[in-house]
Amino acid sequence: MVQILFYILVIFYYVAGVNVFHIFLQMSVWRPSEATVYLPPVPVSKVVSTDEYVSRTSIYYYAGSSRLLTVGHPYFSIKNTSSGNGKKVLVPKVSGLQYRVFRIKLPDPNKFGFPDTSFYNPETQRLVWACTGLEIGRGQPLGVGISGHPLLNKFDDTETSNKYAGKPGIDNRECLSMDYKQTQLCILGCKPPIGEHWGKGTPCNNNSGNPGDCPPLQLINSVIQDGDMVDTGFGCMDFNTLQASKSDVPIDICSSVCKYPDYLQMASEPYGDSLFFFLRREQMFVRHFFNRAGTLGDPVPGDLYIQGSNSGNTATVQSSAFFPTPSGSMVTSESQLFNKPYWLQRAQGHNNGICWGNQLFVTVVDTTRSTNMTLCAEVKKESTYKNENFKEYLRHGEEFDLQFIFQLCKITLTADVMTYIHKMDATILEDWQFGLTPPPSASLEDTYRFVTSTAITCQKNTPPKGKEDPLKDYMFWEVDLKEKFSADLDQFPLGRKFLLQAGLQARPKLKRPASSAPRTSTKKKKVKR
């Protein structure tokens, strides 16, 4: 102890010129900073892959549709204009620039009559389908369909103009046609795909503004339905509400909504039901350059150019509302996404191909077969040609063939699995007929004698209300495959391709004839002569 005090005095002697006592004092009363303390996040339930609770079997089925055909007018639907039938559609709108959204209805595997049911226990397990193979067949030849507008708002050619145009007149619209952006698309999921487009938004403080003001824009998400228009090269937007002139784009989209698949939202969906996988190929270049006629709502600032002389055409600056005409360029069979099989081994989301609700959604876009057929009907027969003696019609036809390979899967219904599925979609357990069974009623019931008498209340039993379809307000091309399942995969083209790539062997159908035993040659005995 004496040595420790000695060393302390020696230290004080050498640091006598430095005041270190306040340092020791500060260290003795130091406290941590009173800044904000960040606590760890509250644990939340995780979304797991379907492979965690779905067991796959070695049972596969093939299912295919019939030849699916549709024919209509490529630009607009034709309605009956007679009195009383103004809303009846005589010829629908069928364009190569439309989405085809097929809603595939599958049979309930829990009601299947399997020859051997020993592979699962119906008391503790349920069966579901998993899509493992898909082939979308497209008929009809390759072709480019064009569209246009008989009164398109096109003022001047801004690409190869040899003179400066003057002021636009009252009406400078022209008849112009063009081809569109080239798109091939396939989306597979058990829920409808989600699209996005720009629509008219709501201004702040209910300020509607003055007539002619630019409307606010809002990105809108909506379900892609069968018949919705794709992005043709003019953007994904609501042309009906954002273009009042109805002359800025071709007639097939001037009053429509062009949607683009919202890949970002579907990819970030927690359960991954809308997008198992997708195939996409887009191609476009610009063919011509024009500008619009009309008053510019946002004029070019004066500091960006030097004013022209009053004596020439440059005294008035032309419209800077430039726009191009898109083009999808050449279509070839070498760049086709269709008429070939695709095998689903691992989906990009948590749903690895499980068809919840016994349904599947296949979304198809193919603008490489968008040929518009011209039909001509004779009104009056004469020896000389006259235009008035013939009527011209436009029609577009499409042909599809859908083939699938489904794998039978089973789910063991533990308490954790049922809780997870109920949180994901409560209707799944309802379809599996899980619920509390009410006890037998012990109350006294009333029974009337004359059930048809008008003196008593109606005795007809109210029919039970059927299950309401949550997608009844949407338009899909429904394809029923409930009676088109087959276990004989080798009898169908896609089934044979699946057996080949999976290394499986089809069950023999015919018994081979028993091979006959080889004849034993009898040696001749030598006879002495």
Swiss-Prot record:
SUPFAM superfamilies: Group I dsDNA viruses. GO terms for biological process: endocytosis involved in viral entry into host cell; virion attachment to host cell. GO terms for molecular function: structural molecule activity. It comes from Human papillomavirus 52. GO terms for cellular component: host cell nucleus; T=7 icosahedral viral capsid. Its main location: virion. This is Major capsid protein L1. The keyword Membrane does not apply. Forms an icosahedral capsid with a T=7 symmetry and a 50 nm diameter. The capsid is composed of 72 pentamers linked to each other by disulfide bonds and associated with L2 proteins. Binds to heparan sulfate proteoglycans on cell surface of basal layer keratinocytes to provide initial virion attachment. This binding mediates a conformational change in the virus capsid that facilitates efficient infection. The virion enters the host cell via endocytosis. During virus trafficking, L1 protein dissociates from the viral DNA and the genomic DNA is released to the host nucleus. It is found in: Virion; Host nucleus.
